[in-house]
Amino acid sequence: MNKFAIFLLGCLCLAGAVSGQSLEQTTEQRLKDFFANYETSYARIGKCGLERFEVEHEKKVLRVYASPTFGYQPFTEENVSAIYRLLKQSLPGPVNYYTLQVYADGKLIEDLVPNAYRKKQDKTRLYGKLDAKGNPWVTNVSRPYEISRGLEGRHIALWQSHGKVYRNERNEWRWQRPRLFCTTEDLFTQSFVVPYLIPMLENAGAVVFTPRERDWQRHEVIVDNNTCTKGSHYLEVEDKKYRWQDTDKPGFAQKYQQYPDNYNPFTDGTARFIPTQGQPEKAFAEWIPDIPEKGKYAVYVSYQTLPESVSDAKYLVFHNGGVTEFKVNQQMGGGTWVYLGTFEFDKGRNDYGMVVLSNESSQKGVVCADAVRFGGGMGNIVRGGQVSGVPRYLEGARYWAQWAGMPYPVYSKSEGKNDYTDDINARSLTVNYLSGGSVYNPTEEGLKVPFEMTLGLHSDAGFKTDDELVGSLGIYTTDFNDGKLNSGVSRYASRDLTDMVLTGLQRDISSRFGVQWARRSMWNRNYSETRLPAVPSMILELLSHQNFADMKWGHNPDFKFTVGRSVYKSVLKFLSTMHGTDYVVQPLPVNHFAIREGKKKNTFTLNWNPVEDVMEPTAKPQGYIVYTRIGYGGFNNGVYVRKPEYTVKVEPGLTYSFKVTAVNRGGESFPSEILSAYKAKRSKGTLLIVNGFDATSGPAEVNSALLQGFDLKADPGIPDGQTPAYCGYQQGFNRDKAGLETGDGLGVSDDVLEGRLIAGNTRDYVFVHGKAIQRAGRYSFVSCSDETLESGSTDLTHYDMVDLICGADAKTFSTSMREALAGYCRQGGRLLVSGSKWGENLQKDDFGKNVLKCTYGGRFSNLSSVPVKGAGTSFRIQGGANESIYAVPSMECVMPVEGAYSAFAYTNGNYGSGTVYCGEDYRTFVLGFPLECVENTDVRTYLMQTIVQTLLSKKRR
């Protein structure tokens, strides 16, 4: 080859190298530009970037590795296709024709699409045929319906973030998070998990465990063969053939009222066992508690798992509503507290308040009996020379684990040196110990309970100064144990769970409230609660407890319900995907509930309507459960009916109360409001009680240019039932102090409400009014929801008197409600109206003046619980947050029009609180305060008697 040819070849090679280098640089710049400018409407993930890229020109492959933030977003098959398309369009030729592979979070982005949302599933992160065999840990045998497409047989562990812990370095008990916006995370997350998420999962058939105490009952009664709470009694009845004996394993005994660190009460006593029989009631053990105060108590049993233990130990819980039967699989979970359910018990020791364990079984073996616990109780673990001083449900998981018999390394890896980190680790390690030896955790030793996922619900820090939402964040961990869970399943199953929960929340919250809920990132990071569990796990940072815009929603009970239902649905769909099974979503609660007198003598007929869930096509009812309560007792186990109607025969002289749930193959809805009815023995007529009090709400909001927060003193709101969420009253309202967590920082709150259960709407006030009517005279009564009145399905003319409960609901007097009441009055009706917050509605179309015969005189402050006087008596209505009845911070001033007169007044008589109209055409009695909030039963009865006599007497007053 001549010199020129060699030179020319060299030039060509140099040009090719320069051209290749230019292509690489252009590709790199285009990739950097793409990721730097990348935004997604799916989530707020922050700035993305390019980590590196690889080009194989020979194979025509371009591999792109995005920064971690790019993996924080949710991936679907649709947005993955869009990313590839847009990225290719931005690349130079010929690279834009190469096979493109985009990596994030350690995988191709198409592999990050959750299995539930993709056509070709990743089997490495599915359980597939891996499943627990045999009976669940606990089964409610008395449940009157079957669940076949819910979470039946599934065992789920979840927890409500932090609790009070002993801080070793400070030598004091402290919350783990600051007091902000009237709460602290340690209290706040309880109000989502315990009243909403746990029951929804259980209603779907799941066995739910939480490593923190779930029962808000301060009292605790222990009944045991070794030691009993004073007044309680343990009894054994033996068969001629079989006798109770001590087990070789130790059992529970409560030797002390308070316990030091590293002391296990489940090794201080004995446990008892007896061989099983096929015939019922041959031999049994009884635990009869001496209940200190009437109320609801969680019931926990305990036993030891023995080589011959059976999986169907028969427990009977006798409570105020009857008897509920459970089957407990004693082949797992021995040596700890096992939750059966929460029931209502009367004060004292009663033969209808106890737990019985029978030796009846379908299996040959033994049943074991140890202590039974009633109620959550107070914290009893001593740290630094003192107990926490709060109910056990407010303490961290570390202390519950010790009381529950967990080994010391489970709840104190630090050997007592750092309770804070021990508490964080104890949540996961407790679940691992319980599940050790099960199909989902075969590599660890433990109690063989087949838990298959965990979820920790937290709230986060972070704030915005422009009333913008911070929103929800999810956390999971894949970089541990070679990327596998203890069952061998890929840890990316945890990402699937995280993605599905966040996707569900964004969809459900946005749809329910018409607000674009903020979805944040999915972090693949090294957190104890997602690293340590042997099963798929996630942390849900639901919202920011430091941000006012988030907490406006966080304090809203309807929001709490929506969050609970959304997370439940995501868990249902996740586990159904993991096992390849179909699912059905449990229905929504029914509405339009009404009780009418039946066609036959001494019967009542109940009617209601199902509620469609537009978000979930499978959530259709297939039947209903009607629960009954007689008098002051508890609700029974319910009766299944196929249609939305039920007729019940009653005994005159007794008050019957009912609540209804909807059921399908996926489970059971939350209950309806509670309605009541009564048939007098010699009835003079029938009255109708209308429940117009549906409302729940958060506390009063303050949001101006300078001030922001929640004013619990002005109005603590209306919790759903009751809530432990409030720590105290907000002290710092200065918007300029946002981000400061002490001193005068925005949201900083005091501690005066800590440990108190603030009362809200029980949805059971028809019973309160009804009992007053029952005592007032020989009148029968039935009841209905306000929806039935508004829809025209209830004919008011059938009733001698109508009692409308407005409670503290500002929306009671809708247009259709006003029309129905006006029509009733025009036909000679007798109407009682009581409540607060509704006064402004009187001015609409002169309804107050023309129908109720009163005018609105404004609101009267009741923050100091001022006296109300009238009808020869005086009483007070609770104005502030308290534990006995929902607060009424302001009451309505009502003034009579011509022809009517004042019957009640506030304080000195200058502010009218009740009016009476006794015309020739009809009669009304209007109260500017809720009658049910008159707490003294005798006074309330006297007031109702006065009202009934006034409205129904033949003489005109």
Locate each region found by the language model.
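Non-catalytic propeptide/linker segments at domain boundaries
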Residues: Y65-S67, Y72-R174, A369-V390, L394, ...
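Beta-strand-rich modules
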Residues: T647-G667
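Pro/Thr/Ser/Gly-rich low-complexity, intrinsically disordered linker/stalk tracts
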Residues: F574-T618, G667-G685
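A glycine-centered loop/beta-turn motif at secondary-structure junctions
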Residues: L532-H545, S566, A776, L789, ...
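A glycine-rich, often tryptophan-bearing local segment used as a flexible ligand/cofactor-contacting loop or short
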Residues: D795, L804-S902, T907-N908
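Active-site-adjacent mobile loop/cap segments within catalytic or ligand-binding domains
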Residues: Y263, T270, P275, M354, ...
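Aromatic-Pro/Gly-enriched surface loop or interdomain linker
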Residues: Y196-A204, R212, G384, I674-D800, ...
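Active-site microenvironments of hydrolase-like enzyme catalytic domains
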Residues: L394-R491, W523-Q546
